[in-house]
UniProtKB/Swiss-Prot annotation:
Protein name, entry field: Putative uncharacterized protein ASB16-AS1
Region annotated Disordered, chain positions: 1-67, 110-160
Compositional bias ranges of the Low complexity kind: 50-64, 148-160
Superkingdom per UniProt: Eukaryota
Amino acid sequence: MSGPPSAPQGALAAPRSPAVRRKGLQAPSWGSPGRPAAHSPWACGPPHWGPQRGPRNAAAARPGPRSRWHKRCAAACGACARPPGHQLQPPGAGAPQPGVACSYLGPRPQRTPCSAQSRPGWCAGPRRRHAPGTEPHVAPGRAPPPRAGASPGSRLLPGSPSLLLPAATWRTWGQESKVLRKILKAWDPFSLL
């Protein structure tokens, strides 16, 4: 560490020095490089292994970064966005000329399953919205174990003997037949004549 203890790291020059006047005031840098090495696994953030979700429908035919995460990643290292041997073009060079058909696009590729797609470079991709196995439509074989109590999938029929009934039901079981018998005994059909 150099400089007075009160000065932040990276801000060692006086504010009115010629170097600061040339570059302008900057936030102090703690030695982080402007462009990380493209071959580093940490170039685009922490490495994330496992199946990646690829683009769907029309987005599958469009190359390059497709999300905000990828745009930031491509701006940081360029490893994910540019294929090997890619030459930087001047701005406007890739724009099609008016009246000229785009012959270099070619047919759209077949849609591939998401798990089979791998992104070039070390790019990990955005984090999953759901933990594995808890997607809205759970893949077969990855269904979570049933919770305690009756779940909608294992609901038993009302006449099933293994269905546990509340204690109040057992106490009142058969009482309705006694009440009906009392009413029938008290009611005299000959009293209506």
